[in-house]
Amino acid sequence: MVSIYFFFFFLLFYALGSFPTGLIIGKLTQKKDLRLVGSRNVGATNASRILGFKWGIVVFLFDFAKGLVPAIICLRFKNFKDLIFINGCDNRYKDIAICLLVILPIFGHMFSIFNKFKGGKAIATSVGVITAINPFIGLLGILFFVLLFIFVGYASLASIMATLLVDLLLFFINHHPGITNISQNQILYFFIGLSTCFIILKHHSNIIRLWQGKEYKFSFIKKRK
């Protein structure tokens, strides 16, 4: 069975994921509430649009770290599994609990306890989780997002496509530095797939606007007057 430490880390990782980075930075730097302007989202894209590119990067890095750090603690610290369980628990249940803690910051970001259980789309946070599992896939996902974003100008489309690409790579690449056994691998596939479904659902309004041709488009080339 789980120890008291499991519940401690459960609350800690959820609270960390829930921390509204964009909301705090917007209010501290420019006294703007990202929930009320632009796309009304507290993520890095809306922060870039409203606060400027520099602050958008800052929001991305903080949200990225919210996913990266807890996942590293769960997957890379050899004694972590023993810490959160009492002896006698089946290894498969241990793997399920570990994988749940790994993705918890993603759902914390989407359903923030500090924002009436509302939140962002968790792209940066999920990339942080993926990078902890497999740094190569995480960095490749970021590169793919950046290139597609520059090419098409739609952050939402680039986010969805990069998320799907990362999922496919995780599935087809069998070895991941952050995963210690096959059972944990399979369980993580399930949880990552579940979080991807929520990410796409969070983008439902963007998908509708893309279909209608009304989605906000970034322009990286300034027009000459």
Curated annotation (Swiss-Prot):
Report TM segments. 6-26, 55-75, 95-115, 135-155, 160-180, 187-207
What Pfam families does the entry give?
G3P_acyltransf
Subcellular location, record wording: Cell membrane
| Topology of the protein relative to the lipid bilayer | Multi-pass membrane protein
Q: Name one GO molecular function term.
A: acyl-phosphate glycerol-3-phosphate acyltransferase activity
Question: Which residues belong to the signal peptide in this entry?
Answer: none
**Entry keyword annotation includes Transcription:** no
Q: Which reaction does it catalyse?
A: an acyl phosphate + sn-glycerol 3-phosphate = a 1-acyl-sn-glycero-3-phosphate + phosphate
**Can you name a GO cellular component term?**
plasma membrane
Q: Which UniProt keywords apply?
A: Cell membrane, Lipid biosynthesis, Lipid metabolism, Membrane, Phospholipid biosynthesis, Phospholipid metabolism, Transferase, Transmembrane, Transmembrane helix
GO biological process annotations for this chain's record? phospholipid biosynthetic process
Q: Does the keyword Lipid biosynthesis apply?
A: yes
User: Which pathway does the record list?
Assistant: Lipid metabolism; phospholipid metabolism
Enzyme Commission number, as recorded: 2.3.1.275
UniProt xrefs under PANTHER family: GLYCEROL-3-PHOSPHATE ACYLTRANSFERASE-RELATED, INNER MEMBRANE PROTEIN YGIH
Relate the protein's function as given in its record.
Answer: Catalyzes the transfer of an acyl group from acyl-phosphate (acyl-PO(4)) to glycerol-3-phosphate (G3P) to form lysophosphatidic acid (LPA). This enzyme utilizes acyl-phosphate as fatty acyl donor, but not acyl-CoA or acyl-ACP.
Q: Which family does it belong to?
A: Belongs to the PlsY family.
Instruction: Describe the protein's quaternary organization and the partners it interacts with.
Output: Probably interacts with PlsX.
The name this protein goes by in its record = Glycerol-3-phosphate acyltransferase
User: What is the originating organism of this protein?
Assistant: Phytoplasma australiense
